[in-house]
Amino acid sequence: MTMSGTAEEALRREYVIGEEIGRGRFGTVRRCYAAATGEPFALKTTPKAALRELEADPLDLALAEQEPKVHLLASAASRHVVALHAAFEDADAVHLVLDLCPGGDLFALVSARGPLPEPEAAGLVAQLADALAGCHRRGVAHRDVKPDNLLFDASGALRLGDFGSADWFGDGRPLTGLVGTPYYVAPEVVAGKEYTEKVDVWSAGVVLYMMLSGTVPFSGATAGDIFQAVLRGNVRFPPRAFAAVSPEAKDLMRRMLCKDVWRRLSAEQVLRHPWIVTRGGSVAVN
């Protein structure tokens, strides 16, 4: 993939572009290095041409163009957010220079190891909730929390990445739009309603369920079937997968996967839940 003119020139003055290390729906992620120091980073490039095609959703282009600003705001939210170090943008593409997270992602971890022990899962959820609480305090909703977007840095700490679906909220401005991933999206999003930042807590609840069982709570043969299961919102804990899971962990999942948004926990409340505090240890809020 070739990068765009002026943005590419500015980028290449400061960074040496390396090999491709990932690919998303619209763009690629490459390794890059600071020209002055040799420090490694990840470079996410989103070309705008595909987002301007007739059949493309205009929301996708709008989100790509605002991603640098939203991600910059989120970068200061928590040490568990993948930091944005530089952004280069012109009419053709958006290039983001990000923390390099060489430890893979949570989806790969659970795929390789199967269900995680409760203390480990609690520690990871604490880190995720810290990232979300920080973002929410700054008026940023991620809107695509899923294991693929939860990365591990060189020290093994969890980092929330990919703010390509993120948006601002607050001051009476509701969130709208069907964004996210079917297995992890909250029912109020599927229903086409206005919604709040608590959609991220629902998604984090699905992530916790997946960490403890190796499966997801809402599934189906098609995206439509999955959405119907999400709308029903019946959270079950099959004995085969959850026989060894504690009542406290199940209580937290029920509170995160609560269809009633007003009763659903906030990210801050997740951090204070007894299962997180006693098994995962509390994470210092930045």
Model segments located where?
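Activation segment signature within eukaryotic-like protein kinase domains
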Residues: 124-125
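Conserved catalytic-loop aspartate of Hanks-type protein kinases
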Residues: 200
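A conserved loop-to-beta-strand element in the N-lobe of protein kinase catalytic cores
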Residues: 82, 91-99, 107-108
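Activation-segment/catalytic-loop signature of the eukaryotic protein kinase fold
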Residues: 87
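Conserved N-lobe ATP-binding subsite of Hanks-type protein kinase domains
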Residues: 28
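Conserved N-lobe beta3->alphaC-helix segment of eukaryotic protein kinase catalytic domains
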Residues: 46-74
